[in-house]
């Protein structure tokens, strides 16, 4: 009788290295398609949006590639956070990635409704650019952390480190939104409400959904 080997930890799953290499190539290709896009993401992390709200130039190919990098990296981190024991499967990772993509699509739809309701197309486009730059920085941080976390066999340490990274990400988003919007106490309360409803709540939904998928 032949014994079928099982993937019992992330580091022993050969597909993980290929996925991480693919995500790295996505970042490199995006930088080649639009030179300076990654550097710009880091240099504008705490920049304040100009009040002129000028036209924003978009490169659709670069945006598509960077979205693949962001979703793929965050899905890997989410899978690793929800992972307990047993097989570390590529199919499960794809399901988690699809779950992340679905939540992002809902957030985008909500943002589009806000844009349509308040007629803030130019301002919304510029804010979206700054937001995408911020998430590029956050996912670069997650990617570097994953290179370490995928090679250790300590689920408790992995969860705590990923939780700490998530808290740092939320703090960065909070600081960025204060830089963009905060003018008085009312705007500050709006920012807090936004962070809770469109950042923290979706993150909790992602974690719960990933837990069901992995189980």
Tell me what each language-model feature is:
Residues 24-25, 63-81, 102, 106, ...:
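Hydrophobic alpha-helical transmembrane segments of multi-pass integral membrane proteins
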Residues 30, 39, 43, 78-83, ...:
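Membrane-water interface at transmembrane helix exits
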Residues 142-215:
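Terminal transmembrane helical module of multi-pass membrane proteins
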Residues 26, 47-50, 100-105, 166-174:
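Alpha-helical transmembrane segments and their membrane-interface exit regions
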Residues 53-61, 85-90, 120-127, 154-156, ...:
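Membrane-interface helix-boundary motifs at transmembrane edges
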Residues 82-151:
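Alpha-helical transmembrane segments with an aromatic anchor "belt"
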């Amino acid at each position: 009788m032949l014994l079928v080997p099982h993937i019992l930890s992330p580091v022993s799953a050969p597909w993980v290295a290929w996925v991480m290499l693919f995500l790295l190539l996505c970042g490199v290709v995006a930088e080649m398609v639009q030179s300076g896009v990654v550097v710009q993401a880091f240099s504008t992390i705490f920049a304040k949006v100009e009040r002129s709200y000028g036209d924003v130039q978009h490169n659709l190919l670069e945006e598509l590639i960077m979205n693949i990098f962001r979703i793929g990296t965050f899905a890997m981190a989410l899978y690793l956070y929800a992972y307990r024991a047993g097989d570390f499967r590529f199919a499960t990772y794809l399901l988690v990635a699809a779950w992340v993509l679905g939540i992002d699509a809902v957030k985008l739809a909500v943002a589009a409704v806000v844009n349509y309701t308040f007629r803030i197309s130019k301002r919304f486009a510029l804010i979206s650019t700054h937001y995408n730059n911020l998430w590029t920085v956050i996912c670069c941080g997650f990617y570097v952390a994953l290179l370490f976390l995928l090679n250790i066999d300590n689920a408790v340490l992995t969860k705590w480190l990923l939780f700490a990274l998530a808290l740092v990400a939320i703090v960065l988003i909070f600081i960025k939104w204060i830089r963009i919007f905060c003018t008085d106490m009312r705007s500050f309360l709006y920012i807090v409400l936004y962070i809770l409803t469109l950042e923290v709540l979706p993150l909790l939904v992602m974690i719960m959904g990933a837990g069901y998928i992995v189980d």
